[in-house]
């Protein structure tokens, strides 16, 4: 490895090690909310804009993941249909509401909202929408970043039942380079994926203890076809992306 790649690994490992202790309590609370939703046959929706939408895809139809998750996906708030346009769209008040209406979020459900900055209109309105429907809200955000840029704006962390602070710095990138004032090496995606997969592993263990853990198998594993078909049939009614 080079010096800069070593620094990236060192930074990321240090942040993950810190999260392991600091997030123990909120991660446990998040797992309890998600487990309760699963046991009541409710759903866990996952919403993010820009690169944060990858958290929704990560938890959807995932080998080793739970079938209770529903990604909230729309090209306008993702990257493939126009990255610059999506950055503009997520700041337009009211624009995300028709997207949310498609999913039928209701009382007893959980909405995970992922937003590193935690101040743009789309994640704020998603959290408010879920609360109005009686769903619990879990936020994955950078408290440092959000506090640095809020400037009186509503912050996602103020609307959540559980706040999972990913410890990403303002601006996300962590590595300084000689000869440049710019930084490289964003960390929010790696941190967010780790936090959420750890929580869902905890949930899965709890559901196994209750006798019903709807866990997907990798499509290349023996017996996966039957297992996954049964899960898709069971959960398709409230997941338009299966």
From Swiss-Prot:
Stretches assigned to the SIS domain: 30-214
Record-linked InterPro entries: RpiR-like_SIS, SIS_dom, SIS_dom_sf, SIS_GmhA/DiaA_subfam, UPF0309
GO molecular function: carbohydrate derivative binding
GO biological process, one term: carbohydrate derivative metabolic process
Pfam families in alphabetical order: SIS_2
Family label: Belongs to the UPF0309 family.
NCBIfam families, per the entry: PRK02947.1 (NF002805)
Protein name per UniProt: UPF0309 protein Oant_1457
Organism of this sequence: Brucella anthropi (strain ATCC 49188 / DSM 6882 / CCUG 24695 / JCM 21032 / LMG 3331 / NBRC 15819 / NCTC 12168 / Alc 37) (Ochrobactrum anthropi)
High-level lineage: Bacteria, Pseudomonadati, Pseudomonadota, Alphaproteobacteria, Hyphomicrobiales
């Amino acid at each position: 490895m080079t010096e800069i790649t070593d620094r990236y690994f060192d930074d990321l490992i240090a942040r993950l090690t810190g999260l392991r202790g600091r997030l123990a309590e909120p991660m446990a609370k998040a797992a309890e909310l998600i487990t309760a939703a699963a046991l009541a046959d409710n759903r866990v929706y996952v919403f993010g804009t820009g690169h944060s939408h990858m958290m929704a895809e990560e938890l959807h139809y995932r080998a080793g993941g739970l079938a209770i998750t529903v990604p909230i996906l729309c090209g306008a708030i993702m990257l493939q249909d126009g990255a610059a346009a999506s950055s503009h769209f997520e700041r337009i008040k009211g624009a995300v509401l028709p997207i949310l209406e498609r999913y039928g979020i209701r009382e007893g459900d959980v909405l995970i909202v992922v937003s590193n900055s935690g101040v743009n209109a789309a994640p704020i309105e998603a959290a408010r929408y879920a609360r109005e429907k009686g769903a619990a809200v879990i936020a994955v955000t950078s408290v440092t970043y959000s506090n640095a840029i809020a400037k009186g704006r509503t912050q996602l962390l103020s609307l959540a039942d559980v706040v999972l602070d990913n410890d990403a710095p303002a601006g996300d990138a962590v590595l300084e380079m000689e000869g440049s004032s710019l930084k490289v090496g964003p960390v929010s995606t790696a941190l967010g994926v780790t936090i959420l997969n750890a929580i869902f592993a905890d949930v899965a263990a709890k559901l196994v203890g209750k006798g019903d853990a709807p866990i997907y198998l990798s499509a290349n594993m023996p017996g996966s076809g039957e297992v996954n078909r049964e899960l898709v049939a069971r959960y398709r009614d409230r997941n338009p992306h299966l």
